[in-house]
Structure formats: structure tokens, C-alpha cells
Amino acid sequence: MMRHLISIGDLDREDINYILKKAEEFEDVARGEKKLRILEGKILGNLFFEPSTRTRMSFETAMKRLGGDVINMTAQEASSIAKGETLADTIRVVSGYCDAIVIRHPLEGAARFAAENSSVPVINAGDGAGQHPTQTLLDLYTIKKECGRLDGITIALMGDLKYSRTIHSLIKALALFDMRIYLISPEALALPEDIIEDVSAEIRRARLEEVISEIDVLYVTRIQKERFPDEEEYRKVSGSYRITAETLKSAKDSMIVMHPLPRVDEIHPSVDSTKHARYFQQSFYGVPVRMAILSEVML
Amino acid sequence: MRELVVSKIKEGTVIDHINAGKALLVLKILKIQPGTDLTVSMAMNVPSSKMGKKDIVKVEGMFIRDEELNKIALISPNATINLIRDYEIERKFKVSPPEVVEGVLKCPNHACISNAEREPITPKFYIKTEEMRATARCHYCGRKIENLDNYIS
């Protein structure tokens, strides 16, 4: 049984396949079509030291769909706690209130440190620029469901590859499967070299127009304004990394566009109605995947 | 007869073949600080047939534990240890890098939880050695560091 879920690197291919298979079994429940109360009497503690809407809500939905309860600490409450209490103490206290903790924290490694101080399982919901393993699992689940397989996929990762924790987690997991990976980003936001070195997969930098007709998945991330020294530079870069329905004209029919959301303007609304858009489906898949993780650590 | 740069010790630990210029870092790793009661002698840039130049540290009256001594391999993988009893070498060995070190290195990532003030946390690193060069990876944030001399806390 999985004790904590801190980094995608803690899981092997077999663990991932197991969680994805379990998630599939929960899909009817996630949609509310079937009732299942296997976590009745259990309490999940949501500790969000940084704002989050969808991750926090989808954990809450996952827990409630399985009959469990949730207690929440929001970023606002966290900031008042932070004035006087260490993370170690907060975790020691809250782990006495619940059966598992979900944590999002601005510092890298905070989830691992939380796990070391917790008497209940800890699930990492994002620690700074570090890891976001539940997002990675739902991304893999989306690829598997929508493309029918994980092995043999050609995927392009596009946008902010330097700071995006989603990308850093995802690329490690993609390397466990037989995938060809293209990296599409402005030079200033390229994937850090040490991550490329660590990943034993076929990886190549490319431009979208070179690979659009070849790829099975286009994974887009937000380019954050605050990463740029001036707004002019940001506008130049972000403008060239914007997907429209037109951009996708030469894509394969089966090619899917994914995005961890929220999007700003990197995917034009015209893409939403194309056969390629899967980002809303992807965010729904967060529920069955998180149900699988919660049931795994709590039962 | 060659003159000894540092006098012989009766009992204690001699750390030889330290990379030239690293003796002070060795003391730091062993947590021997100003104000110590120990008798410590140190020689820097001593001519060496094998290494060209080397440093030597002698700590009198104390047998330092192997796991502490092995941490020296992080900055000086060729270092040798002589444990001296009654002016004779009782045991001699080469340091070998530990797989995990706690509380020796400091993570350069300011956003790493191991640098958070007031948290009861000890930095922890996993060590990898290739061709006599050690690199380390932070247990908490995963940051990989080379040239470990720069990160001794």
C-alpha cells in the first residue's frame, strides 16, 4: 500500500498503471452515476498554503463522492498560521484531525518534509516549482483514455518548460513509457538541462509547425507574465505561443490538445469546439484519479 | 633526514592526502571549530610525491568515527586516515563517500524547505561518485549540486 504520494519519481511504471486502472473503475462514481461510500467516516485535511481552486475542489469532490468528509485550511488562514507556527507543528496538529493530508506549499520539498512530520498519509498537491504528482497522474490518465495507450505516443510540451512544476513532474513520468517528446518553448523558458539529463527518453527541441502533423498530444502550459523583466518581452513571447483552430489545421484527426488550466490566452476559445480540445475532459479526470489515490492511501 | 612539518602525535586521528587547500574545510566537516579543546595541527600545501601538494590534519587525543571521517570524501576523495595509538598506526584506511549525508551540505535553492528558518529540519543529500568526483542531490527539493566544497554548511 502506498503510504504517501510526494513525487512522481517515487512511483514506477507498475504503480502508475495500477492507479490509472483503479481510476477507471471510479469513473461512474466520479460522474455521480453510481454511489460508493468506501471512505465513509474518513476525513481528509486540505492544507493549502497557496491559492488553488481546481486541485482543492477536485480533491474535495473525490473525497465526498466516496462518502468521506473534508476539512479545509485556505491560503488566507495559512498565512496567519505562518506568522507563528512552523510547518512541522501545523502538520503534527492537523494529522491528529484527519486520516490523510493534501498539501500545497510555496517551498520545494515541503510535502516531503510534511510527510516526515505526519502521522497520516500526505499527498503533494504542488510544492513551489517542485512536484505535482496528482496532476501528472491525471495527465497520464487523459492520454491513456483519449489516445488508447501510453506507449508509442509522440507528445509536444509547449510553453513555460522552465518553471512549470506540471511539466517537470510530467516529463519524468512520460520517460517511464515509450514516448517521443518534443519541447517547444522560448529560449528563456527552456526545460532546465539537469531535468533533460535525468530523463532517459527521446527528447528534442522543436518548433510547433515542424511537428504539428506528427504528434498525438499537444500539451500546452501558461507562460507567466511575472517571469519576464518587462511587459514588451512577455507580449512578444506569449504571442508566438498561442494556439488557435488555424494552428491545428495540419494536425492528425486524433491529435489531442491538453492544458493543466487555468489558461489565459495561450489557447484561443476557437480551439474549444474543435475535435482536438481535451482540457476540460482532462480536468474532470482529476476526480477519478484523485479518488484512486485517496482510496489507496486511506484504505 | 627530512624535517617533519607537523609533529607526530601520540594518540588520535591523522587525515592525510587531503587535496591542497582543503584542510580548513575538513575541520568544518568534522565540526572542529574555534574554541575547541582538542589539540589540532594542520599543514597546508605540503609537497607530496603522489599529489604534488597536499594538506594534513592531525587531531590529538580523539578517534573520530568512521562515518564522520568518510564525509571528507565529499571534498577530498583521496584522503587517507591513520588512527594512531602510542605513536604507531593502529589502523589505516581510505575515505569512501557516504551514500547519504545529513547536516553537512546546504542546499543552494533558496526556495527549498531545508532553508526555511525555524523549521526543525536537517539538510539531507544523496551522494553519487563518478570518476572520483562527488555530486549530491537534495532529499527535499531534488536540486543536484557539483563542486561540493561550495556547499559545506
Swiss-Prot record, chain A:
Keywords: Pyrimidine biosynthesis, Transferase. One of its GO terms (biological process) is 'de novo' UMP biosynthetic process. It comes from the Archaea. The keyword Transferase applies. GO terms for molecular function: amino acid binding; aspartate carbamoyltransferase activity. Carbamoyl phosphate binds at residues 54-55, 104, 132, 135, 261-262. L-aspartate binds at residues 83, 165, 222. Pathway: Pyrimidine metabolism; UMP biosynthesis via de novo pathway; (S)-dihydroorotate from bicarbonate: step 2/3. It catalyses: carbamoyl phosphate + L-aspartate = N-carbamoyl-L-aspartate + phosphate + H(+). Pfam families: OTCace (PF00185), OTCace_N (PF02729). Its EC number is 2.1.3.2. Catalyzes the condensation of carbamoyl phosphate and aspartate to form carbamoyl aspartate and inorganic phosphate, the committed step in the de novo pyrimidine nucleotide biosynthesis pathway. Heterooligomer of catalytic and regulatory chains. Belongs to the aspartate/ornithine carbamoyltransferase superfamily. ATCase family. This is Aspartate carbamoyltransferase catalytic subunit. It comes from Archaeoglobus fulgidus (strain ATCC 49558 / DSM 4304 / JCM 9628 / NBRC 100126 / VC-16). The gene is pyrB.
Curated annotation (Swiss-Prot), chain B:
Gene3D superfamilies: Aspartate carbamoyltransferase regulatory subunit, C-terminal domain, Aspartate carbamoyltransferase regulatory subunit, N-terminal domain. The gene is pyrI. This is Aspartate carbamoyltransferase regulatory chain. Pfam families: PyrI, PyrI_C. One of its GO terms (molecular function) is metal ion binding. Contains catalytic and regulatory chains. Involved in allosteric regulation of aspartate carbamoyltransferase. Binds 1 zinc ion per subunit.
